[in-house]
């Protein structure tokens, strides 16, 4: 068993705009993060993944970067950033920065030059094409709705933007672009950064011919994802990046890779291939999406969740490494999506944490998850800020004539602003996030759900997360044990084991408010048992043979095999 620090770590994601505002302008900032580092130390996390703080016009909340080597004014200064890094390192917390290199902002100096003329030295830093028959070069749809192409009058050509029109895609076929990216990465690593989370990194290689996507009935544009996800040169580029940059530092890397299968996941994460340490796969995040994509909402089933999680656990075992997550800045709140955010909010938040943190992989906690923050239902589209949500609403209501209330229901369930409402620190005005007017409204349930209340209550979701993190430090089996699913067909109970030598964890989670009976399979015989954690009071003497589970109950036993 080779010990690796990033396998043993727990990562906490900070979305800086919504974390804590130190100066009253309504926007979270770097000094706000510094002010709350003792809170993260108390929770026990090892790594912070910081969403982008680079200079940006903020079209997509910092994922549109105009200067990779400077800090956004709203967030502070480079001096603030250095102080934050020092204060994190003092507390034994590492810093992973967001690396956004599929695209830049259209206000980046490279793009400003690129659009000036067809023979500008920066022209082929981006993907420019002439139109076809007076229309876009192909029929690709942007992830944020509408065409993925924008016409530019200056040279009479179109540029590709898989995201917003203010996020032109970089041309990774150009070795100069790659060199610029690697130099920028070294700039941050030499300042002491401990790794990168790489935004949509599996989209950097496009099929050079940029063919049309499969047309969708009733839609003007088509998905071109098969021509830009896991493209022809993506592994070549990542191996080059590893050779030139990553291999020279002791860091952790995680790639965001929508649409990746376990077989592809291994190509990115098998250590012998020298690319990335782990990826964020999306299969479990797509279980409630139909063929029409994210906004085509379907009920998810526990059977599908078991199948998906088990597939990733088993297929990467001994080859790659999993990232474990249910929440991030792009997803709705897990307790509202997979649990019960009403009567059983606390129980189901703890159950979901148990289910996730006991699997093999590196767990990620998104800010507010550790206190059981929930989705929000703002009354009006005017209360929303996310470009993806606003573009989708406009397209569906204005162009397709859909019922505005039905579109709002989709946003309430799946919108990214569910994750972006301000962190709920206490029950004072604006949840203690800001002394000013918050950039996005606060979830009205902050009076009940907040950090202050969580710290004071020994049975809170926070203290449960803290215990899960401590257990990870005490038991190698949680990090390195192999995973096996038991009870594949049970509609309510997700039960699996982890095994290392003659030790085994039995993880029992009830994904319902029903009270199903758990029975220990006859083939499991043990010498001793110990209850490691549970979200209800449990009689330690209770036999494992047959247990009636309570709503959203979770238990983890450690047994010694004969």
From Swiss-Prot:
User: Can you quote a single GO CC term?
Assistant: cytoplasm
Enzyme class of the recorded protein, top EC level: hydrolase
Please name the PANTHER family in this protein's record: ALPHA-AMYLASE FAMILY MEMBER (PTHR10357), OLIGO-1,6-GLUCOSIDASE 1 (PTHR10357:SF184)
- Key word Hydrolase present in the record? yes
- EC annotation? 3.2.1.10
Kindly list the biological process annotations in GO that this record carries: oligosaccharide catabolic process
Q: Which reaction does it catalyse?
A: Hydrolysis of (1->6)-alpha-D-glucosidic linkages in some oligosaccharides produced from starch and glycogen by alpha-amylase, and in isomaltose
Q: Which GO terms describe its molecular function?
A: alpha-amylase activity; metal ion binding; oligo-1,6-glucosidase activity
Q: Chief localization class? A: cytoplasm
Record protein name field: Oligo-1,6-glucosidase
Catalytic machinery residues: 199, 256
Query: Subcellular location, in the record's words?
Result: Cytoplasm
Q: Name one Pfam family in it.
A: SusG_C
Alphabetically ordered keywords of this record: Calcium, Cytoplasm, Glycosidase, Hydrolase, Metal-binding
Q: Which InterPro entries match?
A: Glyco_hydro_13_cat_dom (IPR006047), Glyco_hydro_b (IPR013780), Glycoside_hydrolase_SF (IPR017853), O16G_dom_2 (IPR045857), SusG-like_C (IPR056300)
Q: Which family does it belong to?
A: Belongs to the glycosyl hydrolase 13 family.
């Amino acid at each position: 068993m080779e010990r690796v620090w990033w396998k043993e770590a727990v990562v906490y994601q900070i979305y800086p705009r919504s974390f804590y505002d130190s100066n009253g302008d309504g926007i979270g900032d770097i000094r706000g993060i510094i002010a709350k580092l003792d809170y993260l130390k108390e929770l026990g996390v090892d790594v912070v993944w910081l969403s982008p703080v680079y200079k940006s016009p903020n079209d997509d909340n910092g994922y549109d970067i105009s200067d990779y080597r400077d800090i956004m004014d709203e967030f502070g200064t480079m001096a603030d950033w250095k102080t934050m890094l020092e204060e994190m390192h003092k507390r034994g917390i590492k810093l992973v920065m967001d690396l956004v290199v599929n695209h830049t902002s259209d206000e980046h100096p490279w793009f400003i030059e690129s659009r000036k003329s067809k023979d500008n030295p920066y022209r082929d830093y981006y993907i420019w094409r002439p139109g076809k028959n007076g229309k876009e070069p192909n029929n690709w749809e942007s992830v944020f709705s509408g065409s993925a192409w924008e016409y530019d009058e200056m040279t009479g050509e179109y540029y590709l933007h898989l995201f917003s029109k203010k996020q032109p895609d970089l041309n990774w076929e150009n070795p100069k672009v790659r060199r610029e990216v690697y130099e920028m990465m070294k700039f941050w690593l030499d300042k002491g950064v401990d790794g990168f989370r790489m935004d949509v990194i599996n989209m950097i290689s496009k099929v050079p011919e940029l063919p049309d996507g499969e047309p969708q009935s009733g839609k003007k544009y088509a998905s071109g994802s098969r021509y830009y996800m896991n493209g022809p040169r993506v592994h070549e580029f990542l191996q080059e990046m590893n050779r030139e940059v990553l291999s020279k530092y002791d860091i952790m890397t995680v790639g965001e890779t929508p649409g990746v299968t376990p077989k592809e996941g291994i190509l990115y994460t098998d250590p012998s291939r020298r690319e990335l340490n782990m990826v964020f796969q999306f299969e479990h995040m797509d279980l409630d999406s139909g063929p029409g994509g994210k906004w085509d909402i379907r009920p998810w089933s526990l059977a599908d969740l078991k199948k998906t999680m088990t597939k990733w656990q088993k297929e990467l075992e001994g080859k790659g490494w999993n990232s474990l997550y249910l929440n991030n800045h792009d997803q709705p709140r897990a307790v509202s999506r997979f649990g019960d955010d009403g009567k059983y909010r606390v129980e189901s938040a703890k159950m979901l944490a148990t289910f996730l943190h006991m699997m093999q992989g590196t767990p990620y906690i998104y800010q507010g998850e550790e206190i059981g923050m929930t989705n929000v239902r703002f009354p009006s589209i005017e209360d929303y800020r996310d470009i993806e949500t606003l573009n989708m609403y406009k397209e569906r209501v204005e162009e397709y004539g859909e019922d505005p209330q039905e579109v709002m229901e989709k946003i309430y369930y799946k919108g990214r602003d569910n994750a972006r409402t301000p962190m709920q620190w206490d029950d004072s005005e604006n949840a203690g996030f800001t002394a000013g007017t918050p950039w996005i409204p606060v979830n009205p349930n902050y009076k009940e759900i907040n950090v202050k209340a969580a710290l004071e209550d020994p049975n809170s979701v926070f203290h449960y997360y803290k215990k899960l993190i401590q257990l990870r430090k005490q038991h190698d089996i949680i990090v390195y044990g192999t995973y096996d699913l038991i009870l594949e067909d049970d509609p309510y109970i997700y039960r699996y084991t982890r095994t290392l030598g003659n030790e085994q964890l039995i993880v029992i989670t009830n994904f319902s408010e029903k009270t199903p009976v758990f029975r220990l399979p006859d083939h499991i015989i043990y010498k001793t048992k110990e209850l490691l954690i549970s979200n209800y009071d449990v009689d330690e003497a209770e036999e494992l043979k047959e247990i009636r589970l309570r709503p959203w109950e979770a238990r983890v036993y450690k047994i010694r095999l004969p």
